[in-house]
Structure formats: C-alpha cells, structure tokens
C-alpha cells in the first residue's frame, strides 16, 4: 500500500513541488468558520482528526452542533479586510504568489506553517514586539507622509473608475512598492483587498512594506487580516509564523507556547486540506527542534488520519521517528505505561498460575523508568516500537483508501488558486463532481473545507456560492448569511442571481429591511435589470405595501431607457392594478398612456383587450371594438394587424350584436390578407413580373374569392374555410404573443 501511495504522490509532486500546494492556494469559509473561534474554543472544536487520533477518517465524527458553533462565529472577529482573494496569474511581476514562492523555503525552515483561525480572535501570542516607540508612532506616521505623487493619482484613478481592471491594480501596487511610499501603499493595498482579498501574495507584500518601515505591529495586523480573509492559505500561515518567530518577545518565557498555539490554530484552520502537507511538516519540524518528541507523535497521530497528498511520506517519516527515538521519549507517559503493561501481559508464561495472580505492574518499574535488565530493556524497546508502528499501520491503511478515492479529483485540480481568468470547463466539471462526491461520502467538516477550497479557485462563479449556501442551510442561518454576504459584497457584486437568492433568504428569515437593502444595492450596481425591479415590487406587494409597489413600477415606466422598456412596466403595473388593487379604470389609463408613446407594440393592445374582455363583453362591445380599431389603424407590422383583425372577427362572431359590423370586419380582414399575399409574391418573384401577368393573377384571385363567397352550398359561409373555431380555445390567453403565426391558418390564401 505504501508503494502505491508513493507512486501517486509522485504524480502530484511532478505538478507541484514539495507538498503540491499551489503557489497561491487560499482558504475560505471553512476556515472562516474557524477564524471566529476563540482559543478556548479550540479545545472543544478541533477537527475530528485531532480528537480521535487513532480512528480512521470514516469514523471521525464532526457533530452538527460543532459545525453550527463554528459557522455562527464566522463573522464575529471580522477585520476591516474583506474576504481573501488569491493571486492571479497576471504577468510575472503582477503575480505576488510567484514572488512569495521563492521565499517559502526560508519560511519552512524558520518556522512551521500554520493556517489558523481568524486573525482577530487568534490569541496566538502577543503580537511580535517592537520597541514601544515605533508602535506608538505608527498612527501619527501616516499624516506625516508626503503628499501622494501625481503618478499615484493617475494609476489610482484608473482602478477607481474600473475596480475590475486587475492589471490596473497590479500597476498601482507595483508603483507604490517600488517607490517605497508608505501612505500610498496603505491606501492602495487596503483598496485592492476590498475587491481581491484572495491574493495571498499581496498580503505578504503589504506586511513586508510595514515591516521594512519599522511598523511591526502594523505588519502583524496585516497578516492577521490576510488570514482572516484566507485562512486556508498554507503559504500565508508559513510566512506569518516565520514573522512571529523573527519578531517575538522572548522576555516573558511564553514565546514557545505562543508559537505552538499559532501552529494549532493553523492546523485547525486548514490541516484537513488535501495539500496541507507542508504545514504539518513544519509543525513537526518545530516540535522536534524543541525536543518535544511526544508532541511530534501526537501530531503524527492526527496527520495519519487525514487524507493528504504526501500521506505515504508522512507514514515513512513517522516510522523513522519511532525507530530513531526511545519510546519513553516519543510516547506520552500514559501510553508508555499502558503499552508496557500490555506487552508484559502478552509475554507472561501462560502456564504460570502464580504469575496470573500477581499484578503485572508490580514487576515493572514505576512510570517510565527503564527495566533493570539491559537485555530485557532492549527487547522491550523493540517490542514497543513494533507495537506503535503496528497500531498506526491500521490508521495508515484506512487513510490510504480515503486518499485513493479522492486522488483523481485532486489530480484534476490544475488551478487551486484565485485568478481573474476564466476556468476551463474541465476544471469546473471536476469541482462539481468532487463536491458531489464529498457531499455524498464525506464528513461535514471535509465538505466545508472542500467548499472553501473550491470558492478560492471558483470565486467568480456564482453557482458554487449558491450551492455552498444551500448546503449550510441545514446547519446555520448565520453561516448562510455569511456566505451570501461574502459573495455579493466582495466577489460577485454584479451577479444578480446570487443577490436575488440572498434577498429571498433574508425575507424567509423575516429580515424584510435587509432584503430591501440587498435588492436596492444590486439595482444600483447593475441598473436596468427588470428581474431586480420586479423582485422589489413583489417584495413590497407580499408585505402589503401596495403604494410602494406601484411607485416602483411607475418610476420604472417614467425612467425607462426606451419605449419598449416603459411598455413592459406599464403592462406589469396594469396587471397589478387590475388583479391586486381591483382598479380597472386606472389600469386602462396606464395602458392607454403607454399606447400613445409606443403605438407599434402589440403587447399593449393585447393587454388592453384582455382588460376589456375581463368585464361584461356585451356591455363593453363598443370599447372592445374601439380597441381593435385602434390596433388596426396603428403603424404596427402587417402580420400583427392581421392577428388583431382575426381576433376582431372572432369576437364579433362570438359576441357581436350587428351582422353589418361582422361583415365589415371580415372584408377588412380579407384586404389585409390580400396585402400580405401581395408582399409574399413580391418577396418570392421580385418586381420583374410583367404588369399584365401580375394583373391577371390578381383578377383571378379576386374572381376565385368571389366565387367562393357566392356559392350556395355550405362552403359559402363555412367555418372550416372562414373561421376555424376549434383552433381558438378558451385556454388561449390574450398575452400569448408567440402564437401570431398560427392565425394565418384561419384564412387560406386565395388560389393563384
């Protein structure tokens, strides 16, 4: 199994050096949930791996209550920075991630990495200490900065006008970094992260600028904001812990505990990420440096239960750790004593009755003291090593099985970091399939972490945000709200669908004012969307604010960008007035005003007819005929006028009180059909037909028509020829405009 695991590891290693972590790999909500926890919470809400070290992944339990507690605290410690973004694959100079890659080895050597919990609540350590004077001067320093140069103003204006111009941001950030301008850097980076918080490389650049100017406290705050935004970023955790080790205050003797707490926050935040190997390796290396071998074993016990890219290498290193050290050093005292008793019982002669009655512990030294007999001591050590490896082998075997189920999905992730460029379809499909697999087979914790990883790479695709929010609905209302807020305010400010879903969610929760503000915000961001305006109208209508609903529609009519848009809203307003407010007169007035401004729009006439039909048709006969005449005398297209002409004949046939009016309508309809036929012949033959031939054809058509009308048999007034009544059922609505083409069948064209 190990060999197979190593071969798979090699495959991924060929794609990404070291642990396979992508240069810009970031973390999102899963860790955001963690970021809201306080240090005291960590002991009760550690990932299942850390709680049940000896159990395989499938047995790990992540209770719904724990998930709820985590997600409910997501936003408690939110810092001014918005959710994190990832580095983009812009030109080399624009890719902060690439520059940071070259610095990663130093970070790994100097400090273990950790993706931790939310920076604001991380009671990891007192922020790295600098002399009090520089820290105190940090705030007053800003106003003392020289005025911003003209070039800065020019570059800043570009991104202010178009925040989605990522290259513009890159040029601005490069400029302030090259000019070493502290005030400009602060303004530029703070503005940049409001739009692209997932670019972890730029968080490090920002922190480095603060550090170079001597503002260690500010640099620490920048790191914490970055980890608040992207807690799944292994790389950012590595840089941060390196920063802590270089700048920590060792005078109080708590430096070691602070670093250890940082690592714990880190592995809690992103330790279950498939590509978190370097974080675990750094943690292990640091504990080894401290000489805490029992802690190293405890870390391995957690790691060997987690499906990661380098799972096989971890097990091999664990065996080396066991073989290279004395069990009493790398095991906790409790496990050491328990294992010693277990081995003593196993080696006790089975036929010795006296031995059975004698407690085995009485033959053994107390605690972790060595056996007096050197030979027995060596044997005991070897047996203990064998037993320790044997128990972890079972964990490894199960973990390898879990890795094998996910390997194809992980290998299919070619861009695990954020970028403004669109993802390939194969990448999107891989994420969809991976999420579906984890939803069906994984624990809630693993599902959350995978969603968070997905949202880094797919931050600009609303389908994944929506899917994540739907998943969290069964766990926590606050978690759902957090996801929608992050999607709509940071990553997808101009995607209406996710905003509409967020507003609907808030309305379901009874937060009507919040729903209103969401819809207003998206309408400001993307003006002119009918779906948003109609959702605002329906929101007000559902809650009895009819005046506001009417005002919204009236405003849309008045401020329509063209007559067609105004007509659309006029129809909506008329329907509301009729169906909801029971005001037929006002509805008719709205439609008539719309007809005056847009007389070629057939939908207005159809809705006006529907309005007239809704009453007593016998009493409204004159108004209905007037409506038909208004449509027929308009400058609508001929095909539309034929449709209204046919409907006028239908109406008079069904409800008319005057045969003369009916016959006049029929004759008018025949003239329109003849006009249409003439246009068809011209389209087919052009204007090259001799006038004599064209006249003969027209005469024959007229004669044939007259003969049909004059025949004394049923065909002279036959519904099958003149009015195909069955084709017009009561199920048809006046508003079904797409059926215009069907009305030509009512009147077959004159024979030619």
UniProtKB/Swiss-Prot annotation:
Keyword Nucleus: yes
Keywords: mRNA processing, mRNA splicing, Nucleus, Repeat
Biased composition (Polar residues): 28-42
Gene3D superfamilies assigned: Tetratricopeptide repeat domain
Function summary: Involved in pre-mRNA splicing.
Family affiliation: Belongs to the PRP39 family.
Protein name (record): Pre-mRNA-processing factor 39
Species of provenance: Danio rerio (Zebrafish)
Species lineage: Eukaryota, Metazoa, Chordata, Craniata, Vertebrata
